[in-house]
Design a protein with these regions (language model features):
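Histidine-centered divalent metal-coordination motifs
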Residues: 8-12, 161, 222
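Histidine/acidic-residue-rich catalytic or RNA/ligand-binding cores of hydrolases
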Residues: 15-18, 49-53, 167-174, 205, ...
Length: 411
């Protein structure tokens, strides 16, 4: 079964998230976008877990769906069987290892809410899991993996957004130089890595040590409307077992939907306070120091990949999965109309397109240009074609500042 899956998301119980992060709204936005399978997010949070138990029903195969009584009326107009949920959560581990402070985020997928109960009980002995849906714990990533395997051998641990400077397994600030250094003798139990918004598969192909891992992509959405910024293209039996096989072996993982990596917040080196954005070559020439204030630059993902790469830029992995780089539809409409994504004009056009043409992913990936033109006009049709063909100008993000993707030549 062809499925689009977004496995790393957050509920309203994580810090800096939208209050809209409820099971009903997640189901609604997933349907609207054309996503068949999403993570629950935040399984460690006790209140959220109880809400999931109340509002979701097990399908008996390791996946859940929203109980019919909770499905929003406006969700029912979208075709298909509705959204499937898989139990998921993210843990922020901050700890000392090999003489350095490490800050690593890991995503865990589990086949049941019962397994989540046991995992949460174990984690609660280590630290506070009540105040943040993504708990911050003084727990070595190796020990987290060991705990998960003990509690639930069928669990899946995926290092999250692996290149982010501050909170990832390979990050420049507080990560490691290899997955093996982080997870030691348990590294063979890691089968997939999340590339994050600021990198794409091609960047990861440059590091031969990563060849054995499946590369997955997820939105890390902090509000339901951000679901699917990145996602996985699957052709699987729609069950936890099918998902497990895809992530652990690649069977049924057909590819990913990506941000243009330059749009991510940490693609280039830079210093946001001074408005300084630099390529790896420029940053090296300056010794990693901000030319305005003299402070240390935040090293971006592009530079960090360059540090660890043993293959030239442009290398194509023979068995690498396909990937598509897209721009969210509201951003396309915004660029074409000249209004902000939150404006009534842009939101009105977005709703009209969804109502007439289908889901957001269908519009961005499949709907013929002529149909888009008939519904939304020539400029929006052209903008979507430019995205599909990669004919865009990329202004890289840096030091927490999102990059910009220009769909039209502004000259």
């Amino acid at each position: 079964m062809k499925t689009i899956a977004d496995l790393h998301i957050h509920s309203r119980f994580s810090m800096a998230t939208s209050k809209e992060g409820t099971p009903e709204n997640l189901d609604f936005w997933a349907r609207k976008k054309g996503i068949s399978l999403i993570g629950t997010g935040d399984f460690t949070h006790p209140v959220w877990r109880e809400e999931l138990k109340e509002r979701l029903v097990s399908e008996g195969n390791g996946l859940y769906r929203l109980r019919d009584a909770y499905v929003k009326e406006e969700s029912r107009k979208f075709p298909g069987e509705g959204t499937r949920f898989v139990v998921s959560g993210e843990i922020s581990s901050i700890y000392k290892k090999n003489g350095k402070t490490r800050k690593v985020h890991n995503v865990i997928l589990l086949p049941s809410l019962e397994a989540a109960d046991v995992m949460a009980q174990r984690l609660e002995k280590i630290g506070n899991i009540h105040s943040d849906g993504r708990p911050i714990l003084g727990l070595d990533s190796h020990d987290l993996l060991e705990m998960m395997l003990d509690v639930c051998p069928e669990g899946i641990l995926i290092p999250a957004h692996i290149w982010t400077p501050h909170f990832s397994v390979l990050g420049a600030k507080s990560g490691f130089d290899s997955v093996e250094e982080c997870f030691e003798e348990l590294a063979p139990y890691i089968h997939a890595l999340e590339t994050g918004l600021s990198s794409d598969p091609a960047m990861n192909w440059r590091i031969s040590k990563l060849d054995r891992y499946q590369l997955v992509s997820n939105s890390d959405a902090h509000s339901p409307s951000k679901l699917g910024r990145e996602a996985n293209l699957l052709d699987i039996d729609c069950s936890y077992e099918g998902l497990y096989r895809a992530i652990q072996t690649g069977e049924g993982l057909e590819g990913t939907v990506e941000f243009f990596p330059e749009e991510g917040k940490y693609h280039f080196d830079g210093h946001r306070k001074c408005g300084v954005s630099l390529s790896p070559v420029e940053a090296e020439r300056l010794g990693g120091i901000c030319p305005v204030c003299g402070k240390k630059l935040t090293m971006g993902v592009d530079h960090r990949v360059e540090q660890l790469a043993d293959r030239a830029e442009g290398f194509v992995k023979k068995d690498g999965k396909k990937y598509e780089s897209l721009v969210p539809l509201p951003e396309v409409i915004s660029a074409c109309m000249g209004y902000s994504t939150a404006s009534k004009k842009v939101q009105g056009c977005f709703e009209q397109m969804i109502q007439t043409l289908g889901t957001e992913f269908d519009i961005l990936r499949n709907v013929p240009s002529e149909d888009i033109k008939s519904c939304a006009g020539e400029r929006i049709a052209e903008g979507i074609e430019n995205v599909r063909n990669g004919k865009v100008k990329r202004i890289p993000g840096y030091d927490g500042e999102y990059g910009k993707i220009q769909l039209f030549d502004e000259n």
